[in-house]
Amino acid sequence: MSTKPSNVVFNIDEEFGITEAIATIDNGDFGKRTIRFETGQLARQADGSVTTYLDDDTMLLATTTASNQPREGFDFFPLTVDVEERMYAAGRIPGSFFRREGRPSTEAILACRLIDRPLRPTFVKGLRNEVQVVITVLSVNPQDMYDVVAINGASAATQLSGLPVSGPVGGVRMALIADDAHPKGQWIAFPTHEQHEQALFELVVAGRIVSKKQGKKTVDDVAIMMVEAGATEQVVDRVKAGAPAPTESVVAEGLEAAKPFIEVLCRAQAGLAERAAKETQEFPLFPPYTDVVYDAVEKKVSKKLRSLLTIKSKQDRDEATNAYMEEIEADLIAQLGSDDEAAASKAIRAAYNAVMKKIVRHMILTEHFRIDGRGVTDIRDLGVEVDLIPRAHGSSLFERGETQILGVTTLDMLKMEQQIDSLTPATSKRYIHHYNFPPYSTGETGRVGSPKRREIGHGALAERALVPVIPSREEFPYAIRQVSEALGSNGSTSMGSVCASTLSLYNAGVPLKAPVAGIAMGLVSDEVDGETRYVALTDILGAEDAFGDMDFKVAGTRQFITALQLDTKLDGIPSEVLAQALSQANDARNTILDTMAEVIETPDEMSDYAPRITAITVPVNKIGEVIGPKGKTINSITEETGANISIEEDGTVYVSAASGAAAEAAIEKINAIANPQLPKVGERFLGTVVKTTAFGAFVSLLPGRDGLVHISKLGGGKRIEKVEDVVNVGDKLEVEILDIDNRGKISLAPVKNED
């Protein structure tokens, strides 16, 4: 394929033993970016070590190391990916008590998942040695995002390590930017944070180079392995103003635009490996079963297993297929005559699952059969309900077949925004989405407590789907926490969480810019009667996810996509097949939105238990007066009214209270200070004595405005020696304004009791 947008240069410093590959990414009018891979200087004892640079300032060290011996008893590949964020990379000291880095940030965990997903399939099947990939962020330009650079660095280090892997993986972030010079939008690679703020949509795409036959020729193409994508916060307003909407076709164009950049990154890594890689070592491989075992299982189970797979209920189907597997296992262990019964049992079970996968795939491709009897475009029965939890600010229950999600919304003051201490420029997050996946959701036991990486990833996907439709802080001055509880799982709880969140947010009274729904799709492909067939499945089950070649989750409004996640095992997907699958997902999304709209389609009244937050503006030069010395004034308003008050640097004041009356009382007191209506001579006030002196008592009339009752006025016409003989600090005193001088000083007199 063409490599016109980019080029690769290699350099070798034989004196110092350093080899480097430099890939140039050409974004046309938006300039060039340089990705540099360097090996030979740092971490030389690791099996593979590459220092990766984005331009000059962003620098990551990627290492890959394997254990000497395979892990016994493992029936999976033990790959671990860790991202170590060092705060010195941004010239900062960690904000923790001990002033050192602690548990990984959410951004680091999401970066680990971005690296793991495309890298794991490149390792040879059957490898059981532990492999650890560690990315250490050494330096980061505040304008750059390091996660996609880390994908390339991890792949390059693995290519040099001598481990049995296929070709390199290239990763690129693409941003769709529309401006006066590019009104239809242009996709650019490795956008800066400034460009991220301007973008309509972003894609993180990872892929590899594959060889394909075209007639008698063999040509190289880029096979996409992973996509993580989402619309930006301003997309709804920008589209209304005429910017291009990130529809299915626009997103597909972005995937194609990423391919040339992925190719050049893969070529740079491959060239580095040619010059500096260790010789590939021999590692013991542990295939899950032998051909003999597979043939024996297939011959014995095919007919009955095909019948069992038509049971619609997940639990009933699983019980029936598991019982049959145990029956087959008992028969074949004796028949095969293995010395190691445990190993034979494991092999028979693996072969049984492989045969089951083959049967399901063949039935899908030839008969459009699905395990639960649906057609390929059918959605499972939907259930929608809101306002389940009495004291929650908003709640919902979304059911799709056996997948059940409880959504709960909580609203609070903006000061409750999540504070972020990471290497990104973001310092806070107003919309927070948390996802919980307890073991009982699949009828199992297991660990509960702190979230696992999968839960953090699913929460981030659901959050990304909703962020574009969350109202601005000016329109809705609340911090919003959305929690998705997966109560039952059989296919895409993350997309169920998107639907439940829309319902719950509406129930809480949040004025979303548009409702959002999500759907999980699958794709099955294989050779049938000499031709390659593709079948896209709508609303996949857990089993269909495991048996398919590609799964992708699409969330969006009726007009455009807000989030997309894709993983595939195929060596490339024809563009027309992807277009058809995305169109199928769009139809399903609209069907779900129709069902949700029957229950709720506009914001409800806010819950009685939700705080009432009102925003007012005070002059910046009055902020100090509102706060008062050491916070005295603002604290007194809070104590008197029960309201919480938060003041921004621009003079915006947010007042939160349990009732509207308390909020109004606080606002009245703040306005009296910041936007005062000066009291007039003759007005009467019930004030509070705030200070006594030898010459009189100071009485607070309004917050920040006091007057003086001279000692001569306190005795009711009689002479008194001490002010404290009549009034003390804290006493309530009804007074009348006698005079206001040209400096604003107020003279008061007690109001005589007319009794």
Swiss-Prot record:
A Pfam family annotated for this UniProt entry: PNPase
Domain (KH): residue spans on this chain = 611-670
Localization of this protein: Cytoplasm
Which EC class is this protein assigned? transferase
Keyword terms of this UniProt record: Cytoplasm, Magnesium, Metal-binding, Nucleotidyltransferase, RNA-binding, Transferase
Report the GO terms under cellular component.
cytosol
Q: Which residues bind Mg(2+)?
A: 545, 551
Q: MF terms per GO, please?
A: 3'-5'-RNA exonuclease activity; magnesium ion binding; polyribonucleotide nucleotidyltransferase activity; RNA binding
Q: What is its EC number?
A: 2.7.7.8
Domain S1 motif stretches: 682-751
Task: Tell me the cofactors it needs.
Answer: Mg(2+)
Q: Which reaction does it catalyse?
A: RNA(n+1) + phosphate = RNA(n) + a ribonucleoside 5'-diphosphate
Q: What Gene Ontology terms for biological process does this UniProt record contain?
A: mRNA catabolic process; RNA processing
User: Where is it mostly found?
Assistant: cytoplasm
Instruction: Spell out the HAMAP family in the cross-references.
Output: PNPase
Q: What protein family does this chain belong to? A: Belongs to the polyribonucleotide nucleotidyltransferase family.
Q: What is this protein called?
A: Polyribonucleotide nucleotidyltransferase
From which source organism is this entry? Corynebacterium diphtheriae (strain ATCC 700971 / NCTC 13129 / Biotype gravis)
Higher taxonomy: Bacteria, Bacillati, Actinomycetota, Actinomycetes, Mycobacteriales
Q: Which gene specifies this protein's sequence?
A: pnp
